[in-house]
Amino acid sequence: MPNTNVFTGMDGSITIAVDDAESPEGQAATAVSDGFGLAPIGRATDVSVSVTSAMRPFHEIGQRYATELRPGNVNVEGTMGRAHINGALLRLMLGDAAAGTRPAGAFVSPTFNLSLLLENPAKPGQRSTLTVHGVKIDGWSYQMPEDDFVLESVSFKGLWIGVEDASGDAG
């Protein structure tokens, strides 16, 4: 049954998981997740995920309006901010290349799934989970303002996205 609840960010949690722990990309993500205790990802803020589909209109000669819309490539991307407490997000982007020494050559970029779980504590079992699969972080920034929290932010891309609703007990 589809979820009909509304949520706030207070109802959310963010976790990462690895689909293929045997691949070099999965091993790199597992090492960062285990080493930095990223289950769940704490102190996150301003999370956004967007999905776009390239839509191509077909125009016939003699017609001003499109006759048909043809779907094209689908892109999944997003951003996330976090109060900076360690180098976990930078390591999720660069893997061992962020370990403090310059890598000698090419290096593996970690790949992981990012799950956003929303569950209202007043209605246990009723939740929505959005999972972005095959995530790679493609941008990282660090802000150190004079009189505010030090924040880091990342942008990411994913291969595909899925959503799952759980209705819990009806009564």
List each language-model region with its residue ranges:
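Structured soluble/peripheral alpha/beta segments that form catalytic or ligand/cofactor-binding pockets
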Residues: D46, T52-R64
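Beta-strand elements of well-folded, non-transmembrane domains
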Residues: V18, V51-M55, R82-N86, L116-A122, ...
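Short secondary-structure capping micro-motifs at structural edges
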Residues: H59-R70, M93-A104, S141
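A generic structural signal for short beta-strands and their flanking turns/coil linkers
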Residues: R43-T45, V74-G78, R102, V108-L114, ...
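Oligomerization/assembly interface segments of phage tail-like spikes and tubes
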Residues: Y65-L90, E146-G162
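Mixed-charge, glycine-accented linear interaction segment located at domain edges/termini
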Residues: P2-V6, P124-G171
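Short, acidic/charged, Gly/Pro-enriched secondary-structure junctions
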Residues: G95-L130
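Polar/acidic, low-complexity leader/linker segments enriched in S/T/G and N/D
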Residues: M1-V51, I161-G171
